[in-house]
């Protein structure tokens, strides 16, 4: 009898262990991203997500989103954040900072409570949409409600949604303060206060708003700050509003290891022609092209379209619904090139971007660092090319000195191994894509690759009506003056047939 009972107990234990190991096999895990990664994300302690002892439902969302192992910033942050301690974390762009604060935030949410339990602040509307989607995706098995609120949208819609339970509120500071001041967003029992891109949120334009928002939170709140750059203003905020924060600094160097940086000296009137040459010579999966003003964004997008390349543009003066559409379509691979202002330098994660071009060279090292960080995401390879005129040479030297890096002159031929992947169709698209859209995107990408690699491997771009997307509401007074700068020199025509050296 005793032997039979022992045998039964033994079998039961084995059955439970079996189910413990089988739950992973039943998950709908995406195809593994086989691209090589740099030490920015591979230099870990060897921890697994299971080592954090988080809820199984949360781990299910993590693995179904394509996560395999925690990155260095996640290894350092998650265990400390789970204890409720304040955190000041600094890590490179594209190394997994968002998941580093989203995972512990989700773990500490009580879905049975109807109160708002976490506030995540970001500086831009696009980043708010992206962060809220990460929260929804990783927490999809937890029964948690996530709401995103930003300026440029109707306030009444937000008021109606806040009548229901909202566990995590993601938004931009101005809109959240508006809702809190009106008593619509109740933050009195919200113990978690997160700031992503904290250096931007603590700039003079945002700091008063941030401090007002903190007054709506309980005194025993947890404050977490994340960014790639921390100016002196962050220290004063830390001393004033944080309690013995745990400081994490993984910035042994400022630039990402996987990004190759070049510059090309060109006259202002030659820039469009040089860009045309780059388009014809580079093997671009997706590219982001940065300009220093709203007017130049629109003018350059128009020029690129006239050259025959598909192009979207985005800047802060566009209607919010237009910005959202451009951002959504570009992330989903509808268009190959995006021209934008510094609106999209913060936190935007588009895995398919392998080339960043600074059509206008930035004025400071911080902006430069965030711009080039749009390629080479999560330890992958990327290419950053800077078009430099005579006036930019001092900024080039200054940025090299501040970042401790050397930007090389562009060679006649760029090695494709530095930024091109063997199978770009396997690059993960946004984790929110429904299967039908993902399949459609992959089929379009495959068709494009077939066309682009025809003609002896010469990489050509798709044409298409309506590719010049998103007419903004920017000021037009100086458009004619800016447009003159883009004109080609006499006797020189634009177009793919014209080739010129880029250095």
From Swiss-Prot:
Pfam families: DEAD (PF00270), Helicase_C (PF00271). Gene3D superfamilies: P-loop containing nucleotide triphosphate hydrolases. It catalyses: ATP + H2O = ADP + phosphate + H(+). SMART domains: DEXDc (SM00487), HELICc (SM00490). Residues 1-38, 425-503 are annotated as: Disordered. It comes from the Eukaryota. GO terms for molecular function: ATP binding; ATP hydrolysis activity; RNA binding; RNA helicase activity. CDD domains: DEADc_DDX6, SF2_C_DEAD. Residues 7-18, 434-445, 480-497 have a biased composition (Polar residues). GO terms for biological process: mRNA processing; mRNA transport; regulation of translation. A motif (DEAD box) lies at residues 196-199. Keywords: ATP-binding, Cytoplasm, Helicase, Hydrolase, mRNA processing, mRNA transport, Nucleotide-binding, RNA-binding, Translation regulation, Transport. A motif (Q motif) lies at residues 47-75. GO terms for cellular component: P-body. Belongs to the DEAD box helicase family. DDX6/DHH1 subfamily. ATP-dependent RNA helicase involved in mRNA turnover, and more specifically in mRNA decapping. Is involved in G1/S DNA-damage checkpoint recovery, probably through the regulation of the translational status of a subset of mRNAs. May also have a role in translation and mRNA nuclear export. This is ATP-dependent RNA helicase dhh1.
């Amino acid at each position: 009898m005793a032997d039979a009972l022992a045998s039964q107990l033994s079998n039961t234990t084995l059955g439970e262990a079996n189910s413990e190991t089988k739950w992973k096999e039943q998950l709908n895990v995406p195809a593994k991203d086989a691209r090589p990664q740099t030490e920015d994300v591979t230099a870990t302690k060897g921890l697994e997500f299971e080592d954090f002892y988080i809820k199984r439902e949360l781990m299910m969302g993590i693995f179904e989103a394509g996560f395999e192992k925690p990155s260095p910033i996640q290894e350092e942050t998650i265990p400390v954040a789970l204890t409720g301690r304040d955190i000041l974390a600094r890590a490179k762009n594209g190394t997994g900072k968002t998941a580093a604060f989203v995972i512990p935030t989700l773990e500490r949410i009580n879905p049975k409570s109807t109160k708002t339990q976490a506030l995540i602040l970001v500086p831009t509307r696009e980043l708010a949409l992206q962060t809220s989607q990460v929260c929804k995706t990783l927490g999809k098995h937890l029964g948690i409600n996530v709401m995103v609120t930003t300026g440029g949208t109707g306030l009444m819609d937000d008021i109606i949604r806040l009548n229901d339970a909202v566990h995590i509120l993601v938004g931009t500071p101005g809109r959240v303060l508006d809702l809190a001041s009106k008593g619509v967003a109740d933050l009195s029992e919200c113990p978690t206060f997160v700031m992503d891109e904290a250096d931007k949120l603590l700039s003079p334009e945002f700091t008063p708003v941030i401090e007002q928002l903190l007054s709506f939170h309980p005194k025993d709140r947890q404050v977490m700050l994340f960014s790639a750059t921390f100016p002196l203003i962050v220290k004063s905020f830390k001393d004033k509003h944080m309690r013995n924060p745990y400081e994490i600094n993984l910035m042994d160097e400022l630039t990402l290891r996987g990004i190759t940086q070049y510059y090309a000296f060109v006259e202002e009137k030659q820039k469009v022609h040089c860009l045309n040459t780059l388009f014809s010579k580079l093997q671009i999966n997706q590219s982001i092209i940065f300009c220093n003003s709203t007017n130049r964004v629109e003018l350059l997008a128009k020029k690129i379209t006239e050259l025959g390349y598909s192009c979207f543009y985005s800047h802060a003066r566009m209607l919010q619904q237009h910005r959202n559409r451009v951002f959504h379509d570009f992330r989903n691979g509808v268009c190959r090139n995006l021209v934008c202002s510094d609106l999209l330098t913060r936190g935007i994660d588009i895995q398919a971007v392998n080339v960043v071009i600074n059509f206008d060279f930035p004025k400071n090292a911080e902006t430069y660092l965030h711009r080039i960080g749009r390629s080479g995401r999560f330890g992958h390879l990327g290419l950053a090319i800077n078009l430099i005129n005579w006036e930019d040479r001092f900024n080039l030297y200054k940025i090299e000195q501040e970042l401790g890096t050397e930007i090389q002159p562009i060679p006649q031929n760029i090695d494709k191994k530095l930024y091109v992947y063997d199978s770009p169709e396997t690059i993960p698209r946004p984790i929110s894509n429904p299967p039908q859209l993902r399949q459609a995107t992959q089929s379009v990408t495959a068709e494009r690759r077939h066309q682009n690699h025809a003609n002896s491997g010469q990489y050509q771009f798709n044409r298409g009506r309506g590719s010049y997307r998103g007419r903004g509401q920017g000021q037009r007074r100086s458009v004619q003056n800016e447009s003159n700068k883009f004109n080609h020199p006499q006797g020189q025509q634009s177009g793919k047939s014209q080739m010129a050296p880029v250095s």
